[in-house]
Amino acid sequence: MRTIDKLIAPHLKLAPVLVKRAPTLTLAFDDRRKSRLAATLDSGEEVALLLPRGTVLRDGDVLVADDGGLVRVIAAPEAVLYVRAKDALTLTRAAYHLGNRHTPVEVGADYLKLEFDPVLADMLKRIGATVDQVSMPFQPESGAYGGGHKHGHDETFAEDYALAQQVFGEHHGHEHSHDHEHGHSHAAHEHSHGHDHTHGHDHDHGDHVHDESCGHGHHHHHAHR
């Protein structure tokens, strides 16, 4: 059994005749996002996919087997919801609600496509979208932060979430640092001019005595709060 363990980068262009002659592997989206898979080429040959973890294959991708042979990926037709709307606002609302649910979505110029789900179909109809169940290849958008050649929520969500947290931390950390420094500066300014705050430690003034003859009209009970 041959092992397929390499994916040719999309920017590397192969001779069209080589790609055309390569045996094909037709997979639905759920199998295309598995990095470990026992599969059968359309020719009937059984192969083992051992791709880098997180790889999600797309229609037209070219794989390399351990013997140097090429294999071309075909996205199989599958049951999906094909979503359209009478206006851009309704379609945008549909995309927003699907995104809130971390649903893998294929985005077209005037349509959305997602895996068949009767609950989501009902939700989309309620906001005014037109929803049809069809059999078509499904190629959802890649993760917002993951980038690269990875696609699909299950394989990229953890990475996307971690990167999103990192981005948030960098921005939030900067703002917190700024606020913290500003707060200390402001507090120090008030401390240098205030006469009514207290300090919880005694000041040794040597022979200077605070009594009726001191001449001071205020008291220093200093306690930092």
UniProtKB/Swiss-Prot annotation:
Subcellular location: Cytoplasm
GO biological process: protein folding; protein-containing complex assembly; urea metabolic process
Keywords for the protein's UniProt record, in alphabetical order: Chaperone, Cytoplasm, Nickel, Nickel insertion
InterPro entries, A to Z: UreE, UreE_C_dom, UreE_N, UreE_N_sf
Basic residues: bias regions: 216-225
UniProt-listed Pfam families: UreE_C, UreE_N
GO MF terms held by the record: nickel cation binding; unfolded protein binding
Coiled-coil stretches: none
Domain of life of the native organism: Bacteria
GO CC term (a single one): cytoplasm
Main location: cytoplasm
Keyword tRNA processing: no
Disordered as annotated region, ranges: 171-225
Family label: Belongs to the UreE family.
Known role: Involved in urease metallocenter assembly. Binds nickel. Probably functions as a nickel donor during metallocenter assembly.
Protein name in UniProt: Urease accessory protein UreE
Protein's organism: Paraburkholderia xenovorans (strain LB400)
